Curated annotation (Swiss-Prot):
Listed Pfam families: Orbi_VP4
Disulphide-bridged cysteine pairs: none
Keyword field contains Aminoacyl-tRNA synthetase: no
Family in the record: Belongs to the orbivirus VP4 family.
Name used for this protein in its record: Core protein VP4
InterPro entries: Orbi_VP4, Orbi_VP4_C, SAM-dependent_MTases_sf
Length: 644
């Protein structure tokens, strides 16, 4: 059966280009009715180019159809908003008539648009959940470490510990300058940072520009004789040399219970020193930083110390939890960073990291780390792994038990969880918001397996849990939480439809057929495909109609095709409560709820769309055809319908 497709809507100045392509083209006149649009879009089984007048439709209606807006201009006028285009085509590409360049531009942008979908779900989760499972750097970037508990199973970065493997080289990409990268991966939950050897503050100001939120929530004590004055109220400059813990302690207020981080990046000038003197000085500076941090271990949660590898020693000792390479460092820079887990208060539970202790270092092994991981053309993924490893609490969300509200985004259907489907459904039942991959098209960028859509619907829908596809979830949040998900959000609705999303949300009251639930693009085509491939699948429905009875074709085809994810509790309440009203009452409820639809049959406006027995017959027929293969209980839904 066809998978979700996108409608690639181009403004008129691009319509001549798409005519040179191989995707179908859909011309919109602006005179189409709701049902015309629904029926016509349903005929396409691939992404389709569209152009013409869409000004009478709202953003939610068009997103419901899978529209992505493409133009050389900034905006497109819709019925309710002026929409910022999703894909801005450079004018030189438009003038060139180069179809490959045009489609590459769309494809590259669509990959980036996936982030908009994930960010929107995370924004909702940040409002509703305390615990975050399956987390990566994207969650850390926006989490509040004083409120949120961030769990996951991130990839472990290259680390040096006694008797441990360093790890293998991996592909990487360029990143920020070395010291900016250092602040980027080490600063997360600390509220007070004591940064010794801060230099002229350029690094700190670059970090402020890169991550203003994290910069602002820290009180910075910076120590360096050359540090200039700073106008930022959260930066306190100390123009001193730090020789002992006393130089730091006098600036600490122990009446405040805060998480503190110690950074030591001290390097004196070489001046007239020979090689031996210079190496001895550097070695002593690094050890002094470790000693000061260790002596103040009760005041700091952790420390990050400069660590230069000596040329003249085959082995040496330092105080360390881990040594690791530096993202963005030059390939010939034989300097690591030394992370020390200390005993001070922390918002993040870092008990899985060993306490800092005296460690023997084999010089050839740590030099190998430099050779494997340093270089100006590397650092992005190293930095990400360090950030995740230091600040994400290592826990498997499928096994974790807690009473805290939790979010489970983008990990449940990782291939490592294959065979654990019962646990996945249990998590979706408990979670404030959870996602699972249901797309059947080849997946090139992620290592996920697909859950059957019909099983997800039958297993995932409860009175207080709504199950929708990812596009439906975004449309629902636009409708019910417009302060969290704005109408102008840029995302790829076709990509979103490859996910099932469970939300701890009750059925809307009244239970209106909003776009977020009722889209069923291509349902008529799905029904025809079933008939022309295997007419026995429709025999019971045909016979019932000859007898003057009925079953819900929408429900039956939805389940049989495996092409849709939608909430059954909400759907059944629509049929039994909302659709039982007359036209005036139906329209009143839609208006009062500010709901929108993309399918409307005028001939059914005054009548119920179906009755209880139609739904029961559809479920029974699905059970008769697929019951032996369906992993979810159908009988429980039949029993519920009898009493709903």
């Amino acid at each position: 059966m066809p998978e979700p497709h996108a409608v690639l809507y181009v403004t008129n100045e691009l319509s001549h280009i798409v005519k040179n392509g191989f995707l179908p083209i859909w011309k919109l006149t602006g005179d189409e009715s709701l049902n015309d649009l629904w029926l016509e879009n349903g005929k396409y089984a691939t992404d389709v180019y569209a152009y013409g007048d869409v000004s009478k439709w709202t953003i939610r209606q068009l997103r419901g159809h899978g529209f992505i807006f493409i133009s050389t201009h900034k905006n497109v006028q819709l019925a309710d908003i002026i929409k910022t285009v999703d894909v801005r085509i450079p004018r030189e590409v438009a003038r060139s008539h180069d179809m490959k360049a045009f489609e590459n531009e769309i494809g590259r942008r669509r990959i980036r648009m996936r982030k908009g979908f994930g960010d929107a779900l995370r924004n909702y989760a940040f409002k509703m959940a305390i615990e975050f499972h399956g987390s990566e750097a994207e969650t850390l970037n926006d989490a509040n470490p004083r409120l949120h508990k961030v769990y996951g199973m991130p990839e472990i970065p290259p680390l040096y510990m006694e008797y441990a493997e360093i790890g293998a080289r991996f592909d990487d990409e360029p990143t920020d300058e070395k010291l900016v990268s250092m602040l980027d991966y080490i600063v997360y939950s600390a509220e007070e940072v004591h940064y010794v050897g801060c230099g002229d503050l350029r690094t700190l100001m670059q970090f402020k520009k890169r991550s203003p939120g994290r910069f602002r929530r820290v009180l910075w004590h910076v120590y360096d004789p050359i540090a200039p004055e700073c106008s930022d109220p959260n930066v306190i400059v100390h123009n001193i040399m730090v020789d002992s813990k006393k130089d730091i302690l006098k600036y600490m207020n122990f009446l405040k219970r805060v998480e503190r981080l110690f950074i030591w990046d001290v390097s004196s000038d070489r001046s007239q020193m020979n090689d031996h003197e210079w190496e001895t000085t550097r070695f002593a500076e690094d050890r002094l930083g470790e000693e000061i941090a260790y002596e103040m271990g009760g005041a700091f949660s952790s420390a990050l110390i400069k660590h230069r590898i000596p040329n003249s020693k085959d082995e040496y000792h330092c105080i360390s939890t881990y040594l690791f390479p530096q993202p963005g460092a030059d390939a010939d820079m034989y300097e690591l960073r030394n992370f020390m887990r200390l005993r001070g208060y922390s918002h993040v539970d870092r008990h899985m990291h060993p306490d800092a202790s005296v460690t023997k270092v084999v010089s050839r092994d740590v030099r190998k780390m430099v050779e494997l991981y340093h270089g100006r053309d590397r650092g992005t993924f190293l930095k990400k792994r360090l950030f995740e490893h230091l600040h994400i609490v290592r826990k498997n969300g499928l096994l974790h038990e807690s009473d805290e509200p939790r979010a489970d985004l983008f990990y449940l259907t990782n291939r490592c969880n294959m065979g654990l489907e019962p646990s996945i459904y249990e998590v979706m039942k408990k979670s404030v918001i959870a996602t699972a991959w249901v797309g059947r098209a080849p997946l090139y960028d992620y290592d996920d397996f697909a859950l059957p859509r019909s099983t997800v619907m039958l297993n995932g829908s409860y009175r207080d849990i709504s199950i929708l596809d990812g596009n439906g979830a975004i449309l629902y949040l636009m409708w019910r939480y417009p302060d969290i998900v704005k109408k102008d959000l840029t995302y790829d609705p076709a990509w979103a439809m490859n996910f099932a999303v469970s939300l701890k949300e009750p059925i809307p009251d009244p239970p209106v057929p909003d776009i977020s639930l009722c889209r069923f693009i291509g349902l008529r085509v799905e029904s025809s495909v079933l008939r022309v491939r295997n007419p026995t699948l429709h025999e019971t429905a045909d016979e019932l109609k000859r007898m003057g009875l009925d079953l819900s074709g929408h429900l039956y085809v939805t389940l049989m095709s495996g092409a849709y994810v939608t909430d059954l509790f909400w759907w059944f309440n629509i049929i039994l409560d909302w659709s039982a009203q007359n036209k005036e009452q139906k329209l009143r409820d839609l208006k009062r709820s500010a709901a929108e639809v993309i399918e409307w049959k005028e001939q059914m406006a005054e009548r119920p769309w179906h009755v209880r027995n139609d739904l029961i017959r559809a479920l029974r027929e699905y059970k008769r055809k697929m019951g032996m293969r369906e992993g979810a209980s159908i009988d429980s839904w039949l029993e519920l319908l009898r009493h709903l």
